[in-house]
Amino acid sequence: MNYLTHQLLNPQEINILKKNLTIKDLSWEDGKKTAGNHAAKVKNNLQLDRSSNISRKCAGLIEKKILNDVLIKSFALPKRIHGTMFTKSLKGMKYGRHIDNAFMSSGRADLSFTIFLNEKDKYSGGE
C-alpha cells in the first residue's frame, strides 16, 4: 500500500475549518450511520451531518485543495471526490481497526484521505 503524507492545508485554511467545525449548534450524528458491517462494530465517534451548510462549505474547501494539489494529482489522479466526512471523537470514543468499504453509497472509494486539523500530539490511535 502506498501512502502520501504532506501539508495540504495552510494555517489560515485550518483556522477557517476549525472555526466552522466548532460552531455550537452543529448536527453531529452517530458515526455508525455510515459504517459498513465490520466497521460498525468498532466505530464509536461522531460525524457532522453531511447535508448541513457547514459540512458542504468545509467539504468544498477541502475538495478544491485535493483536486488542485500537484502532489496528489501525480500520486493518485483523482477524477472526483465524494463522501467527504468530518468526524470527531469525544472522551472515551474511538474508531477501532477496520478496512473502509471499496463501494460506498456514492460510488467506488479507491482512495481514502485523512486530514488532521490539529498537531499529531493531540491525537491517540489511528496508527
Label every PLM stretch briefly.
Residues 1-78, 83:
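Non-heme Fe(II)/2-oxoglutarate
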Residues 70-127:
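Catalytic core of non-heme Fe(II) oxygenases with the double-stranded beta-helix
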